[in-house]
A protein has these predicted regions:
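Short, conserved catalytic or adaptor-binding loops enriched in Gly and charged residues
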Residues: 53-56, 90-92
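Glycine-rich, N-terminal phosphate-binding loop and its surrounding beta-alpha-beta segment
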Residues: 63, 77-78
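Phosphate-binding loop of NTP-binding sites
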Residues: 15-16, 34-35, 67-70, 79-149
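Beta-strand->loop->alpha-helix junctions that form or flank phosphate-binding loops
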Residues: 44, 61-63, 99-103
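Generic detector of well-ordered alpha-helical segments enriched in charged/polar residues
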Residues: 5, 52, 103-106
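Short, glycine/polar-rich helix-capping loops at beta-to-alpha or helix-loop-helix junctions
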Residues: 48-54, 83-86
Length: 149
């Protein structure tokens, strides 16, 4: 099992990562994992032909989530994946660490991060904060569900 308390010294080349959700941010997480040398497996219920083409260079499954997901040391979930689906429950039962793709990416940057959560108004607030930073002469990049995954 991966020790998420000691992320920086982890040997990513020997780490198996399952990514649940093959949307824009899931694919970005897969590319980061591949760049780190990790073994990547992508699982999604339903993908478009365009997404299928983007994930063909990774081990993947579509049309459901099999027990292959459970072969991972780390599970990275995309924002649209509900915590309540059976495969997530099985990952928890097996004590496989589960993180969002944003958290996974945050482990590999030294830049300051402004993060927003909540039910309503996140996109508007993120755009407002971005514009405030830019007007103050700061470099600002939008990430997550808006901007760069």
């Amino acid at each position: 099992m991966i020790n998420i308390q000691n992320i920086q010294s982890n040997n990513w080349g020997s780490t198996r990562i399952s990514i649940i959700g093959a949307g824009k941010s899931g694919i970005a997480a897969a590319q980061l994992g591949k760049h780190l040398g990790s073994e990547i497996f992508i699982s999604d219920n339903n993908v478009s032909p365009d997404i299928q083409k983007k994930i063909e260079s990774f081990r993947n499954e579509t049309g459901g989530h099999s027990n292959k997901v459970l072969e991972a040391h780390l599970i990275v979930i995309s924002p649209g994946v509900p915590d309540s689906i059976p495969i997530i429950q099985e990952c928890r039962e097996q004590n496989i660490p589960i993180v969002s793709e944003i958290e996974f990416a945050s482990w590999f940057t030294t830049s300051p991060i402004l993060a927003l959560t909540g039910s309503n108004g996140k996109t508007t607030t993120v755009h407002l904060l971005h514009e405030m930073c830019v007007s103050d002469g700061k470099t600002s990049l939008l990430g997550g569900n808006v901007g760069i995954p």
